[in-house]
């Protein structure tokens, strides 16, 4: 982990994937759990703020920028010169939304079309009736399946609930009963297990980690 003091009010911290791993955290963990985001950022602050100039300030704010190898974090303490500066916002939904947007943009050269498609179709997609839900005991099992899964013709969502990962795959009516789907599900059950848990339940009670193209994103970032 690298730290650079930009000025008396701002610290820049580079957190690579090894640093995240050492803390038992992945980029995926930071996508939806706001309390975990806050705890993680303040743990970084405690580590780099050795003279306690920032920890004792009630108006500390954070900016996060995903990088190819982790995160770039800007920690600022607000004083009268920073009051009203919209560039420095508190920890909120923008953190996880920014990371999600970065993952999607990096994954596709047609990023504008993809973002539009996701925004327009996600609410409708979640109402799809032909869902197959598979549960995985570990994220490593899910990665192993994603590496060999055929995902071009399906939408897939990733949820976490009670420390288990749930992969929800939406199949169209035209291919639901095809041999290809049966073969893919049989393959999925070698790494995970079928479950009666519904997408509606996961949407209400679980934490959604990835939308629309979960299998493709997992394969891309964890190959």
Swiss-Prot record:
Q: Which GO terms describe its molecular function?
A: protein-macromolecule adaptor activity
Query: At the top level of its lineage, which domain of life is listed?
Result: Bacteria
Give a single Pfam family match. Answer: MecA
- Self-association or partners: how does it assemble? Homodimer.
Q: Give the family, as the similarity comment puts it.
A: Belongs to the MecA family.
Function, as annotated: Enables the recognition and targeting of unfolded and aggregated proteins to the ClpC protease or to other proteins involved in proteolysis.
**Domain comment (free text):** The N-terminal domain probably binds unfolded/aggregated proteins; the C-terminal domain interacts with ClpC.
By what name is this protein known? Adapter protein MecA
């Amino acid at each position: 982990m690298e730290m650079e003091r930009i000025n008396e009010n701002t610290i820049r911290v580079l957190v690579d994937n090894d640093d995240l791993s050492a803390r038992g955290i992945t980029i995926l963990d930071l996508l939806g759990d706001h309390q975990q985001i806050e705890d993680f950022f303040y743990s970084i602050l405690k580590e780099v703020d050795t003279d306690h100039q920032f920890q004792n300030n009630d108006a500390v704010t954070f900016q996060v920028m995903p990088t190819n190898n982790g995160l770039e974090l800007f920690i600022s303490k607000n004083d009268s010169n920073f009051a009203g500066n919209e560039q420095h916002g508190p920890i909120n939904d923008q953190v996880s939304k920014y990371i999600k947007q970065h993952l999607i943009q990096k994954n596709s050269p047609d990023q504008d079309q993809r973002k539009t498609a996701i925004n327009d179709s996600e609410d409708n997609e979640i109402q799809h009736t032909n869902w197959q839900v598979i549960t995985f005991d570990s994220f490593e099992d899910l990665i192993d399946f994603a590496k060999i899964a055929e995902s071009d013709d399906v939408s897939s969502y990733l949820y976490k609930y009670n420390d288990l990962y749930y992969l929800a795959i939406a199949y169209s009516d035209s291919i639901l009963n095809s041999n290809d789907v049966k073969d893919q599900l049989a393959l999925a059950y070698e790494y995970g297990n079928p479950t009666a848990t519904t997408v509606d339940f996961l949407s209400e009670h679980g934490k959604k980690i990835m939308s629309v193209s979960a299998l493709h994103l997992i394969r891309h970032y964890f190959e």
